[in-house]
Amino acid sequence: MIAERPDLRHPLADLADWDERVRLMVRPRRYDHVLRVADLACRIARAAGIDEARAYAAGLLHDIARDLPDTELLRLAPPECAIDLAHPLALHGRAARTLLERWGYADPVVLEAVEDHTTGPRGGNPVSACVYVADVSEPGRGVNEDIRELALCDLEAALSRAIVSKVTYLQGRGIRVHPRTLRSYHALPCVGQDGSVPDAPRLPQPDRHPAP
């Protein structure tokens, strides 16, 4: 069932049918994660004065394509780069948007947040920021409590920390960073023209919840 949302007064708050679709599309453990992301995204949005109903909706829908086979992800979201082709899981945000649009979901703010949660917000959509931060820091992951706490008082700083940490972590291990993530990274105010960030932290990667 949908996690309690006592303060929402918005058409998007009526999500029972979509909640059931998500529950049927993902594994039980993933569904629990989805509900935690939706709840945290809603709380972050409320604290920042952002549309919390849209944040909840995007959190609920963000992983609807996460458990699809690689062949289906590639069909729904044609690769944009070599990383997509080698690691189709990176496509599950774009694939989710495609599915939702086909099923009649039409809110562009929510759809963009769903699409961007795997690679990073493209800017100009605060709901995307809420969902991205909530996804990497929801309590069930067991990591990034500092990002979660920061998000409830300074979303912009939390988003910067999450993206910088992810890029630093991947680059430190010689792993190629997705072009969309790099665009989000270089758009951050804290990133210099040479791509460096003073004292950049690394984002811990939980063992039981592989990074998307």
What does each of the following model-derived ranges do?
Residues 40-43, 169:
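Solvent-exposed, charged/polar functional surfaces in cytosolic regulatory/catalytic domains
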